[in-house]
């Protein structure tokens, strides 16, 4: 790969905190899907919040640790299967044509203008990888890497724990690259550089980001302008949801009355189940009755959240 035309910033010996600070300065491959709305883990709002330092660093989860630890295994497994050779780069790559972006790639191919992305995932995700040309969830990331590196193709190897090993090839498509990089540049110039947030969407990850950024409420009032139509729509939708929830409960109860003690029922092409499930819970009242001298309060975990409500004043 012709990486000599690009700027390299070595990541050898770099701490995780240093690496996180560096990746926040530009758009990376893992940000691409969120920017264009193809990720369930990120949105334009959350990427903006991350790049502008409003969100804390993500906790290093067990899944993330496994992904790093098994990256070398996935690469070796891919080489065994394909007969191709790869090597580490250990650097952030920057292309002067795209100053708003960087690439931190897993492996470079030896003797080929290409790269390799290594992934590990749960067996629950196996259906996403069977019988597909290229997994959608990793498509934007690999297009981003081809844009920054100038590679002609990008390979993807996915280890699904206990279920299979999948390999894919994505050929360079300049039109796709141009479209993605235009979207990334527009995102960077429109939102990150002027520190202007994108309009929040309705996803859970955006809701979590807002709750994190504005975790501590202040006892003050602000005047909202131009939101009256939206709030009126909100009130209508809440009423509609209440009516729909009521009808859903009514249908459920009618069917339960039909099934009685039976746990299974069929009707046309519908299969219905109403199964008995057990749930264990801790009885604080019984515990203190049996062990009155033990104080459990030091072990209670207090969580805080802000509750959103809209009250429509009657005129």
Predicted segment positions?
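Accessory terminal regions of nucleic-acid processing enzymes
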Residues: 1-315
